[in-house]
A protein has these predicted regions:
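N-terminal intrinsically disordered, acidic low-complexity segments at the extreme N-terminus
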Residues: 2-18
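Intrinsically disordered and other compositionally biased segments
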Residues: 7-10, 25, 64
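Coil-to-alpha-helix initiation sites in intrinsically disordered, low-complexity, charged segments
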Residues: 14, 204-208, 214, 218
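N-terminal type II signal-anchor transmembrane helix
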Residues: 17, 21-60
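Residue-level recognition of hydrophobic positions within alpha-helical transmembrane segments
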Residues: 28, 145, 218-221
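A structural signal for short, hydrophobic/glycine-enriched beta-strand patches
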Residues: 54-210
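A transmembrane-helix-recognition feature enriched in membrane-embedded lipid enzymes
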Residues: 212-233
Length: 233
C-alpha cells in the first residue's frame, strides 16, 4: 500500500507581516469611514438639534386683556422688551405698563453725567413708542434673579389688586419666567400670561445661536438655570 504523503507548508514571516499589515489598514479605513459618517451626521443633525433646543425654551401664554403689562428686567435686552411691551400697550391689551427695578445700571451717559438704571432706559423707550409717562409704573427693590423678581411682582400685584398680568420678556427667557411666576403666584388668584418679541434682535436667532459664545450663554445657559430652578424651588 502506498503511503500518503502530507506536506505542511509554514507561512513565511514576510507573508504573515503582509497579512497583519493589510488587516490593520482595513481597520484604519473602517475607523476613518465611521468617523467621516459621524462627522457628516453631526454637521447635518446638529443645526437641527440646536434649532429645536432653542425653540423648546420659547413659550407663549396669551391673555387677550390684562390689568397690567409687566416687563421683566433684562439689562442689555431692555430695548426689545420695552419695544414689545409698547406694541402690546398700543393694541389695548392693558391700561398700564409695569417695570421692575433690579438696581442694575447701564453705561456712562455723558449728557446726564451718570450711569442710568436700566429701568430708566426702558421707561424712555416706552415713552418714545407711545406709552404715556403716567401709564408707566415701577416696582422698586427687586432682588436679582427671575424667581425673586417674580415674588416682588406678586407682592406688587397683590397690593394693587391686579389679577391678570401679561408679562413680557425675551424669547428664550419665557419658559423659566412663566414657571417662576406661576410658582410664585400659586394660590394668589393672579393669572399670568406671557409674550415675547421674536428672537434675532437683541437675542440670537434659533438657527445660529451656537455660532457665538453669547448664544451659548443665552440659550444653553438657560437650560442650566432651568434645572437649577426646578431643583431649588
Amino acid at each position: 500500500m502506498a503511503t500518503e504523503r502530507i506536506e505542511v507548508f509554514a507561512a513565511s514571516p514576510r507573508f504573515v507581516n503582509k497579512a497583519i499589515k493589510a488587516r490593520a489598514q482595513g481597520k484604519a479605513k473602517r475607523r476613518r469611514l465611521a468617523l467621516l459618517i459621524a462627522l457628516l451626521g453631526t454637521v447635518v443633525l446638529w443645526p437641527m438639534l440646536a434649532w429645536a433646543g432653542a425653540h423648546l425654551l420659547i413659550v407663549k401664554s396669551d391673555l387677550a386683556s390684562a390689568d397690567a403689562i409687566v416687563v421683566m428686567s433684562g439689562s442689555s435686552t431692555y430695548l426689545e422688551r420695552a419695544d414689545w411691551a409698547a406694541k402690546l400697550y398700543r393694541e389695548g391689551r392693558a391700561p398700564v405698563v409695569i417695570l421692575t427695578d433690579d438696581k442694575l445700571i447701564s453705561g456712562w451717559d455723558r449728557k446726564e453725567e451718570r450711569n442710568p438704571y436700566f429701568y430708566e432706559l426702558a421707561a424712555r423707550e416706552l415713552q418714545k413708542r407711545g406709552v404715556p409717562e403716567s401709564k408707566i409704573q415701577v416696582v422698586s427693590d427687586i432682588a436679582l434673579g427671575t424667581y425673586e423678581e417674580s415674588l416682588g411682582i406678586r407682592g406688587y400685584a397683590t397690593a394693587h389688586q391686579l389679577k391678570r398680568l401679561l408679562v413680557v420678556t425675551s424669547a428664550y427667557h419665557t419658559r423659566r419666567t412663566l414657571w417662576s411666576l406661576r410658582h410664585a403666584c400659586e394660590g394668589s388668584g393672579i393669572e399670568i400670561g406671557i409674550d415675547s418679541p421674536p428672537p434675532g434682535w437683541q437675542t440670537p436667532a434659533p438657527w445660529r445661536w451656537w455660532l457665538r459664545r453669547w448664544g451659548w450663554k443665552v440659550v444653553a445657559g438657560e437650560y442650566v438655570k432651568l434645572i437649577y430652578y426646578w431643583m431649588r424651588y
